[in-house]
């Protein structure tokens, strides 16, 4: 790694993160596109309108995957990962709201909410760091640095 310039390390880190974001979003899109509406959990039923909105959720997650790939091509990080973070945080918040509205009784809802929000927070923190590093490297002198 020492042989790589700071610019190349930033690009490598960005592309690894964007690839992971694209794969994650693509798996979500595939799940929502293929799951039987009768097989969703009660909480997923609330979020997906009893399965009627599964196709819409599949399309939204697919857009997030495409934006991650476009970000790699365009050499920035902001759009795809921001959408992945927003979607994951939204799903986590929805599970937390359902947990509250059902009287704090189903701990699996809380666990699922945490399972969505925690990775969203980690990716958000990484997104802030990578975009700051990109800006610093660009201001320092770009590819030759």
Model feature map: region roles:
Residues 68-90:
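Loop-to-transmembrane helix junctions at the membrane interface
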Residues 1-26:
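Cytosolic juxtamembrane helix and N-cap/initiation of the first transmembrane helix
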Residues 61-68, 91-95:
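Hydrophobic, membrane-inserted alpha-helices
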Residues 117-145:
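Membrane-water interface at the C-terminal end of transmembrane alpha helices
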Residues 51-61, 108-120:
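Alpha-helical transmembrane segments of polytopic membrane proteins
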Residues 17, 42-63:
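A loop-to-helix transmembrane entry motif
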Residues 89-114:
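Membrane-helix boundary connector in multi-pass membrane proteins
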Residues 38-50, 70-78:
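Short juxtamembrane and helix-loop transition motifs at transmembrane-helix boundaries
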């Amino acid at each position: 790694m020492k042989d790589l310039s700071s610019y190349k390390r930033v690009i490598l880190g960005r592309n690894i993160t964007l690839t992971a974001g694209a794969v994650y979003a693509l798996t979500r899109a595939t799940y929502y596109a293929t799951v039987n509406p009768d097989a969703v959990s009660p909480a997923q039923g609330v979020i997906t309108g009893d399965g009627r909105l599964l196709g819409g959720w599949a399309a939204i997650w697919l857009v997030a995957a495409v934006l991650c790939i476009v970000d790699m091509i365009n050499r920035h990080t902001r759009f795809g990962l921001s959408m992945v973070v927003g979607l994951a945080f939204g799903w986590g918040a929805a599970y937390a709201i359902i947990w509250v509205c059902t009287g704090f009784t189903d701990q699996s809802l809380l666990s699922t909410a945490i399972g969505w929000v925690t990775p969203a927070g980690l990716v958000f923190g990484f997104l802030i760091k990578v975009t700051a590093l990109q800006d610093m490297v660009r201001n320092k002198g770009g590819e030759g640095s």
